[in-house]
Amino acid sequence: MAIKGPRKHLKRLAAPANWQLPRKVKAFTVRPSPGPHSMDKSLPLLLVVRDVLKYADNAREAKKIIQTGKILIDGLKRKEYKHPAGLMDVLSIPEMDENYLVLFDESGRISLKKTDKTDAKLCKIVNKTVIKGGHIQLNLHDGRNQIVKVSDATKAEEDVYKTGDSVLVSIPEQSIVGHVAFGEGKLAYVTGGKHVGEFAKIVEVENRALYSDIVTLENKDGEKFKTVKPYVFIVGQDEPVISM
């Protein structure tokens, strides 16, 4: 028979390798709901509460905690236990005065890092389009779209945002309050490949017509390495613009 509708189940053995959960304890785990992040770059809230933060011993307890609305993602209450918490999301628990940033560790696993800055988050521009009225729509890595109103999209002084740049988005207002351009000399966070989870400075960018651009980076130890542009997330000039 044909598969009708979206899949609702996920076996643990088929879950993304960067999820921090035991594989052979049980057969199934939670499949994240479709939304702002892809499955391999996010964790459903239930796994965050139970397996990462260890606030619950089982799924039933974790669901009760989530359904109280005491857990916020990017300043908004999330009561759906399947909701994905993904890269650069700010997860807050106001009652416990705890705030976390979703990142990758050096093994590529999705992890949480404590942070003290909860009023803004970094988003990467993955695409941009001109919409009705000549205004510019920025498509960000976390699924959101931001409209930048301009009088003429062909003027470089108005169209300052480029694909690959990062923008600072206020929480929970969701408006752009800062901009970090992609380019040589900028500090980047590597989101894939052998050097995932590392911070490094961009040394050189090799533009290619048919394939992803190659970016040469240098980490704090002076080691140079290359990766593709989609794995490069700009976070600042000399230091990250947010606490990471």
UniProtKB/Swiss-Prot annotation:
This is Small ribosomal subunit protein eS4. One of its GO terms (cellular component) is cytosolic small ribosomal subunit. GO terms for biological process: translation. The keyword Lipid metabolism does not apply. Belongs to the eukaryotic ribosomal protein eS4 family. Keywords: Ribonucleoprotein, Ribosomal protein, RNA-binding, rRNA-binding. The keyword Protein biosynthesis does not apply. Residues 43-106 form the S4 RNA-binding domain. It comes from Methanococcus maripaludis (strain C7 / ATCC BAA-1331). The lineage of its organism: Archaea, Methanobacteriati, Methanobacteriota, Methanomada group, Methanococci. GO terms for molecular function: rRNA binding; structural constituent of ribosome. It holds the Pfam family RS4NT.
